[in-house]
C-alpha cells in the first residue's frame, strides 16, 4: 500500500452499534487491516458526534490532512496545559489558520500554572507528575468527551512497548459511565510511514523536530532524544513515567494496558 496517498478504496461499513456504544458490533479485524483514510471515512459516517485530539505532531497532522477530504469541520481538541513550549502554541495557531481547523481548546480547572502552584505548590510536574497530567490533560479531556460519541487519536504501535498492542478501535468508559469509541487510524503505521506521508504531501512539521525532539509534550517534562533512543524516551525523563493517562483510562474493549493495569 502506498502510504503517501490521501485515501485508498473505501472500507465497506461494518454493522455499527452506534447508540450508546454499549457493545460495539464492529468487525475489528476488517478495521485493523484498513488504511487510515478508510477508517476515518467509516468513523465519520458511523459515529454521530466525533472529534479528533492532537498536539500538532506529525501523526496528528497526517490525520488532519486526511480529514480535509472527509470531514474538514471535525472538532479538533487541543489540550492547552499551560506548560507547552512556545513553539507548540505558535505552530498550533499556524496550522489552525492554514487548514481552517475547527479548534476546541481544552484547559485544566485551575486555568494557569501560577494558580496550580498556589494550590499544590511549585513544580507539581516534578513532585507528582501523574497528578499534574491528571489535572491538565486527563480531566479536561474527559469533560470534553462527554459531548462526543467517539474520538480519534494518532497513536501508533511502534511508538513504545506500552502502545504495541494498540487496537484500531476500542471502547472507553468516561467517569460518568458514558461509553464512547476511540479510533486509532494510524495504529499499524510506522514512524517511517508517517514521515513519508508528511514529505509526499508537503505537510509542515513541528519546529522542535529539527532540534532533536521526537515526541513533544509539556516543556518541563520533555527533552530531545539522544542517539539510539526510542521516540518517546525524551518524555518524563527520570520520573518513572511514560504516559500521561489520556490513552489508558476507562478501557472497555481493546488490549492496550498500562503497566499498572497488567
Question: Model-predicted segments: where are they?
Answer:
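Nucleotide-activated chemistry modules centered on ATP-dependent adenylation/adenylyltransferase
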Residues: 2-262
Amino acid at each position: 500500500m502506498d502510504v503517501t496517498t490521501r485515501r485508498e478504496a473505501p472500507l465497506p461499513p461494518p454493522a455499527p452499534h452506534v447508540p450508546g456504544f454499549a457493545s460495539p458490533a464492529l468487525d475489528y479485524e476488517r478495521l485493523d487491516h484498513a488504511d487510515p483514510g478508510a477508517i476515518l471515512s467509516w468513523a465519520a459516517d458511523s459515529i454521530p458526534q466525533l472529534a479528533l485530539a492532537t498536539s500538532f505532531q506529525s501523526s496528528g497532522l497526517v490525520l488532519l490532512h486526511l480529514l480535509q477530504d472527509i470531514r474538514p469541520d471535525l472538532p479538533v481538541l487541543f489540550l492547552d496545559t499551560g506548560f507547552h513550549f512556545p513553539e507548540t502554541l505558535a505552530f498550533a495557531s499556524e496550522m489552525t489558520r492554514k487548514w481552517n481547523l475547527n479548534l476546541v481548546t481544552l484547559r485544566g480547572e485551575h486555568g494557569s500554572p501560577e494558580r496550580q502552584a498556589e494550590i499544590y505548590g511549585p513544580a507539581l510536574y516534578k513532585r507528582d507528575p501523574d497528578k499534574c497530567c491528571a489535572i491538565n490533560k486527563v480531566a479536561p479531556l474527559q469533560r470534553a468527551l462527554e459531548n462526543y460519541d467517539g474520538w480519534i487519536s494518532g497513536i501508533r504501535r511502534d511508538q513504545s512497548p506500552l502502545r504495541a498492542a494498540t487496537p484500531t478501535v476500542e471502547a472507553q468508559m468516561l467517569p460518568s459511565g458514558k461509553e464512547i469509541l476511540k479510533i486509532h487510524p494510524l495504529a499499524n503505521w510506522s514512524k517511517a510511514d508517517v514521515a513519508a506521508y508528511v514529505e509526499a504531501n508537503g505537510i509542515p512539521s513541528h519546529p522542535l523536530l529539527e532540534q532533536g525532539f521526537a515526541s513533544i509534550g509539556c516543556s518541563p517534562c520533555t527533552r530531545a532524544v539522544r542517539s539510539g533512543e526510542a521516540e518517546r524516551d525524551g518524555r518524563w525523563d527520570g520520573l518513572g513515567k511514560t504516559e500521561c493517562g489520556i490513552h489508558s483510562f476507562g478501557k472497555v474493549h481493546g488490549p492496550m494496558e498500562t503497566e499498572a493495569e497488567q
